Amino acid sequence: RTYIIFDVIAKYLKENEGFDVFYLQNITDIDDKIINRAKERKTSPLKLAKYFEKEYLKDMKGLKINSVTKYARATKHIKEIIGQIEKLFKKGFAYRIDDGIYYDISKFKDYGKLSRRTALQAEDAVSRIDESKEKRNKGDFCLWKFSKPGEPSWPFDSSLRSSN
């Protein structure tokens, strides 16, 4: 449903309002779900991610969703992702705990404005993935999960590894 809505909006803006729309869509090709399912299926996370990406693109074609200008795989932009997280960390919007780096929703006064929810209301929206009891606020979300032994990993700047 989400992709259909974005496709309709992009097409409307392009065809009816004359906007030059550049629609970039993320392809998450590595995360805990992919790693766990790859282990279950005795395959590599990369192979599994490519399989699901192929299936997803077939579905998009079948639904005639064709307004996406470019797809960006997360693993192809690790340096940029780390750079953005480092900026948030240095500005005090992110913090480190044992399992990863989290965004502190209480630091952004307009957090939830688009969804008409306050940071306190977001406390109710605890993610299945980000249930860590170490989080400062229940609504804080994970920006980066640290890898477990045997999982793919990417190095962070030493200032992030040593800071709390």
Task: Give the location of each predicted region.
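NTP-dependent nucleotidyl-transfer catalytic core
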Residues: 1-164
